[in-house]
Amino acid sequence: MSAPLHRGLRHVALRVTNLARSRTFYEQLLGMRVVWEPDPDNVYFSSGSDNFALHQIPASELTAFQPLQGQLLDHVGVILESPEAVDRMYQEVEPRLSELGGRIVKPPKQHRDGSYSFYFSDPDGNAIQALYEPTISKLEWVKGKT
C-alpha cells in the first residue's frame, strides 16, 4: 500500500460518568470549543482540525459501571510547539486540576527521542499527554482545514 486509506486520526470519543463535569473540565482547562451538541448526552469539541467527543454513560448502565481494571485506552494527547510551551501549560493547568476533578499523572519529563511531555487525567481518570515531539510539533496545522 503506497498511501493510507484515510486522512489521519482526527476523532476520539470518550464515555464519561458525568457529562456536565467532564464538559466543564475540557472547556475550562483545555479551552476546547463545543461545535455540536446533538442531545443532552453527547457533546463534540474541536480545536480546529480535530473532533473530540464526550458521551454520557446511560443512567441504566451507570449504577453497574465499573471501569476496566487494566484500562485499554492508554492516553490521548495534545501537541505543543516547544518544550517551553509544555512547561507553560503545566504551570497553567496544575493549580486548576483538582478543582476540575483531574490530577497530574506524570510531571514534565524529557524523553530519549527528544520529546518532552507531562500527563494529567480528566475527572474519569482518562490520561491526557501534553506533548512536544520534534517531528510532529513542526507540522503546520491550518485551522479548519484537513
Question: Predicted regions span which residues?
Answer:
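N-terminal beta-strand motif that seeds the catalytic metal site of vicinal oxygen chelate
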Residues: 1-20, 76, 134-146
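Short, flexible turn/loop "capping" segments at secondary-structure junctions
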Residues: 2-6, 66-71
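Residue-level marker for the onset of beta-strands and adjacent loop->beta junctions
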Residues: 10, 31, 40-41, 74, ...
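Vicinal oxygen chelate
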Residues: 16-20, 76-123
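Amphipathic alpha-helical segments
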Residues: 20-33
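Conserved short beta-strand elements that form part of the metal-binding/catalytic scaffold
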Residues: 33-70, 127-132
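A short, acidic/glycine-rich surface segment
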Residues: 59-65, 106, 137-140
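Short beta->alpha transition motifs characteristic of CBS
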Residues: 111-112, 131-137
